[in-house]
A protein has these predicted regions:
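Conserved SAM-binding loop of SAM-dependent methyltransferases across substrates and taxa
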Residues: 61-73
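A short glycine-rich, Lys/Arg-flanked "PGG" loop and its adjoining helix->strand segment in the class I
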Residues: 135-147
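A short acidic, Gly/Pro-enriched loop at the edge of an enzyme's catalytic core
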Residues: 113-121
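Conserved class I S-adenosyl-L-methionine
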Residues: 152-195
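Conserved SAM/SAH-binding beta-strand->alpha-helix loop
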Residues: 83
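Rossmann-like AdoMet/SAM-dependent catalytic core
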Residues: 206-335
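Conserved SAM-binding strand-loop segment of SAM-dependent methyltransferases
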Residues: 98-110
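Conserved alpha-helix/loop element of class I SAM-dependent methyltransferases that forms part
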Residues: 18, 28-50
Length: 335
């Protein structure tokens, strides 16, 4: 048993034993959000991701990270997850796809995992917010970065996640005391028509099994913490990192690149936040331009109401080698 396997961790582990996510029947070609994100990062940073040692913290059933390992053939990958069942699926998928540059290990993010080494890039996408102690989780992961390292996080958004949380509460009340009765919970979700999903879960399900995994992950999860720009800043303040920047946000069923600037990169054919269109007033925009980065973050999230944030945390050396101008505009140094 893991040293940090508290009651919440045990519940999450049991949940994924019954309902691994993504579902084992899901094709990796249909879970390409993470590889697309890294491709965008490469385009904007004008540099290929090559020969890096990469950790995927919370691999689940491995679909997304195997897709990435397939793309970044010159990088070496380690995927960790607390669920033995999920890792069995991940290894089967790895063998099926003939991927040789990744290993999977059963580890708890909340444990001191120094024996697996340090990494140039850490991915923790949609996982930290499920930990019993996200602050501790980020602190531990930050210590596993090399001196010029970066960490990508995906965190649930409080503003855009409000309706989903109301739906979760509704289902929980109807379900009653036994919150681990996922079968009944799934039936309730279908019976009242709540089996529709936001960006991140918004996948076309080919089977009941796939949809069951989505329902459990989005509406019956044992534990989650939602964030806004204020609590994101609190999270990073305690991380030991040099600073961070919001890379992108999810809004409803769409993903947007995040930019505090008032002029977008029109050469990049990808949807982006656009403060000029949202405010649509020269005098108000002038006031906006005079605000701090954190105030701009808050204004943008109040206008867009994200249900999720993709965030990059940097070591000092990792930030100094960055050439991505949009991320530099968005960067917040931790005091």
């Amino acid at each position: 048993m893991s040293k940090s396997e508290d009651n919440i961790t045990k519940q999450v582990k049991e949940m994924y034993l019954k309902y691994p996510y993504p579902s084992p029947s899901r094709e990796i070609s249909e879970t390409n959000e993470l590889v697309n994100l890294l491709k965008i990062f490469e385009i904007e940073n004008k540099e290929k991701i090559e020969k890096l040692k990469i950790l995927d913290a919370g691999s689940g059933s491995g679909h997304r990270i195997i897709n990435v390992a397939k793309y970044l053939k010159n990088c070496s990958f380690t995927g960790i997850d607390i669920s033995e069942n999920s890792l069995l699926i991940a290894n089967e998928l790895k063998n099926k796809e003939k991927i040789e540059n990744i290993q999977f290990l059963q580890k708890n993010i909340l444990d001191n995992n120094t024996e697996i080494g340090k990494f140039d890039l850490i991915l923790c996408m949609g996982v930290l917010h499920h930990l019993s102690d996200p602050n501790k989780g980020l602190q531990i992961l930050s210590k596993m970065l090399n001196k010029n390292g970066m960490i990508f996080l995906y965190l649930y958004g409080k503003l855009g996640g409000h309706k989903r949380m109301l739906n979760k509460e509704l289902i929980s009340i109807i379900l009653g005391k036994d919150k681990t009765d996922y079968e009944t919970g799934i039936k309730i979700v279908r019976d009242i028509g709540l089996n529709k999903f936001d960006y991140g879960w918004n996948l076309k399900c080919e089977s009941i099994e796939e949809e069951n995994s989505l329902i459990v992950d989005s509406l019956l999860h044992a534990n989650e913490t939602l964030y806004d720009s204020i609590t994101v800043n609190d999270l990073f303040k305690k991380s030991g990192l040099f600073g961070y920047a919001i890379f992108g946000i999810s809004v409803g069923t769409n993903g947007l690149l995040f930019d505090v600037g008032s002029k977008n990169n029109e050469k990049l054919p990808i949807p982006q936040t656009n403060i000029s269109k949202k405010l649509n007033s020269k005098s108000v925009l002038e006031k906006y331009e005079g605000k701090s980065i954190r105030e701009k973050y808050r204004i943008l999230e109040l206008l867009y109401e994200p249900n999720g944030y993709t965030i990059i945390g940097f070591t000092k050396e990792g930030y100094e080698k960055l050439s991505n101008e949009r991320i530099k505009r968005n960067f917040i140094k931790i005091d």
